[in-house]
Amino acid sequence: MFNGRLKLVENGEPKSDLSRPSGRNAMIVGAGIMLSRLSGLIRELIFAGLLGTRVAADAFKAALQIPGLLQNILGEGTLSASFIPTYSRLIDANDDKDEPGLVAGTIVTLLGLITSAIVIIGILAARPMSKILLPLLPDETFELTVNLVRIMWAGLGFIVLSSWCLGILNAHRKFFLSFAAPILWNAAQIIFALLAWAQDWSNASIAKAAAWGVLVGGALQFLIQIPLVIKVSPSIKLGVKKGSDAVREIISKFFPAVMGRGVIQFSGFLDLFLAGFLATGAFTALSLAQIIYMLPIGLFVMSIISADLPEFSRDRDNISAITTRFITSSERIAFYLVFSSIAFITMGEPLIDFLFERGKFTSEDTLYIWIVLAAYSLGLYATGMSRLYQNLCYSYGDVKGPARLAGLRVLVAGSVGFLLMFQLDRFAIDRNAIIRIGDFPSFTPCLLYTSPSPRDRSL
């Protein structure tokens, strides 16, 4: 197994390069993520005005999840676990200056072959795959979803390859471009959707135009990073380098990481599956709530952990340096996420009103999404800290531990969600009020003496 070498030694202990503070790198990452998230938020604002929470919006959100399986399983999370720690140590070693490029070329070659095969299968099997993963969609929504899935697959394939670029650039401490590149992905969707709207196309046609934006934007997000990747690692050569300990180490960690990401992705599809039991608009409500919920995760947590992962990997033999970085990062995460949770729960309604309530997006939609956002916010801090612990495990080569814990999390979340959704299904939103429209299935004996009139049960 490959073991990187730290260049500096002090009193027999490897010395960390603390002259490169993770806080500065986190600010650079945060700037890129902020611009990217802002463009994503603008995209959602425009789509909400164009499509609301109706059939075309549900179809677009559901369709994006299926090829998104490829991105989430093979993309940034998996490469963070398997590729970045090894590659970061490799570029600091003195043994062979060409080896990092050869290893990186091998990984992108294998990743490209796997991604291409999955994209082709996904396009050909879009209908049965959609039926299996989203079996409860209404017929009208399902047919549109299948068409959108076929268009989107190639775009998400390009985004997987752009995650490889992100890994290369992060390891070389070039953070901004890779995190700002998704602006092009969002911009392409916005432009295509607005062009369709300007031509007075139907909602379904606007959704199809946005799907083509997903494809074009994915290609642009990948291609814009290539020049800088070649600049920082000019020795990259496509092909498979045989007999490399570093390649073997990356591959040995890749498949457990894929399993871990698969478990997390299953959680997302479980949400979609359960939402299929609910009324039209449930997919869109979950998606919009997740976008707001993920803002502090993306802006604060991802900026911190993305800057820390290469340094954790380089400093893993220096316990004091690791401890200092971990404590500093955990304090930052706690500060940002606790405040964000309180803000989302107490001020979520006016925030959603300000962001989305226009066009076909109504005040009832605002209340609906606020409730979903408030529920998500209860786990915001735990989600952020789990990412930090996960990175620490990855830096020491442990990808199986986070995968097991992710499986436990999905089991608990799925069970609780399955039980509660049938209880909360007895609530409805009517004229900006939450009313109960029936007895709770599991607790009916407790409600024998309650008034049968739902109008008398307003909350």
Identify the residue ranges that each predicted region occupies.
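N-terminal low-complexity segments that are often proline-rich with Ser/Thr-Pro
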Residues: 457-459
